[in-house]
Amino acid sequence: MSLPADTLLWKIGKKWISPFIKKFYRLEFSGKIPEPPFLLICNHVSPIDPFFITPYIDVPISWVIAQISFQNPIERYFLKKIGAVQKFKSRPDPAMLYSIYNILNQGGVVGLFPEGTITWTGDFQDHLISPKSMNKLILSLNVPIVAACIQGAWLSHPVWADHGRKPKIFVDFNTFSDYSAMEFIHHSEWEWQKKHLISYPGKSKAQGIERVLWICPHCSSFRTLFGKRNEVICSSCHNHWLIDDFGFIGGKILPDLFHHQIEVFSKWVQDLGKASFPSVKVSIRNDRTTNLIKSFHQNLTIENDIIQIGSIPMNILKTKGLNTHFRDILE
């Protein structure tokens, strides 16, 4: 009897794509994998994280994927062919839970990224996880919990970057029966890099930096940073910082610069009282199906915990979830 997700596409990928991925990304693995069924959890550092897992696991995995990824017809076709499970973000999803239980009861393997979205800074995203809900899920399954910690993938190609670097990726596996599995995947690329100092050389390492850094760390000007080759440059004060082969920006780590700008931006919004962004592209989708209702350009303002899109007000405090999709879309 075949396992769930044991499809022709999986067989082709396992035989032909996995060896290429393992060689190209210079993957190194450690740890043992139990016999199925089991739940696989993993930190989320790259859009292609599943491809870093598959070469080491000899059984097909049914990955839990955000429902919006199924909106593209081509993407939907391939996701269905590999037995992916749809998940609505930031709300209870009984259908997803039923699918997980059903796959495990059939002796299959389910792959899950508890963070739900790729890290922009290289640090694990604790704020996106409900320990109570995750612990409840783990205890209800009565199967081994295999934890996979991916290291080096984010530094090989930061999600904000236009170009990747020469990759070197490590994946460690361990098996648990409780919430301690979550501690195993709690990974910071930067703490790991400080310890190992692995070189990730590449060209134009700074291009795309404006997606994640918008405030100059020297003069605090807004939207003046840009990447040119391997340097981050401020068009206002003309300071510049080199991104070296270890990923450090002027000797500093990205999370420190990122959190500093959040503090500066928060104070700026408070002092200003109102922040305005002209002609923002807005897409409104059905809450249940995520089908597109309408798309338009409109002015956007932020004032007193209210995001105002034209004449449409949204209370920030009532927002259930926040996510950046495909690097350019804020959900």
Go through each PLM region and give its residues.
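A cross-family acyltransferase "interaction/gating" segment
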Residues: 109, 121-180, 200-206, 210-218, ...
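Short Cys/His-rich micro-motifs in 6-15 aa windows
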Residues: 238-246
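Short, non-ligating residues that shape and space the ligands of small metal-coordination modules
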Residues: 223-226, 243-244
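Active-site-proximal cofactor/substrate-binding loop regions of enzyme domains
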Residues: 49, 75, 79-113, 126-156
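Catalytic core of membrane glycerolipid acyltransferases/transacylases, capturing the structured
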Residues: 34-91, 252
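Phosphoinositide-binding peripheral membrane targeting modules
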Residues: 288-330
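Anionic N-terminal interaction surfaces
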Residues: 249-300
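Helix-to-loop junction immediately C-terminal to a conserved catalytic motif
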Residues: 8-44
